[in-house]
């Protein structure tokens, strides 16, 4: 079964029916300018990728349509840094997110046709 939650070193991402929910500590949320519990709907998400920090730790990066793209990882409200051993889990989670986005886009296109 696919992983529907990732717990990182600076937050957590939950995969829900409505989109992704980012949970952060108070200080992490303030540093990113968001609430501690931050929801992003599927329609707002362009995709997700796995990146890495300069020290080699995996980072899940979620691209959101209306979000600025010039934020550094530590200030990006849609990025979660993980432990080094979690690269496989991050890759599976990103694949699940991207598959969900593609499925919803196909549904939207079929509904418009």
Stretch-by-stretch model annotation:
Residues 10-33:
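Short, compositionally biased strand/turn segments
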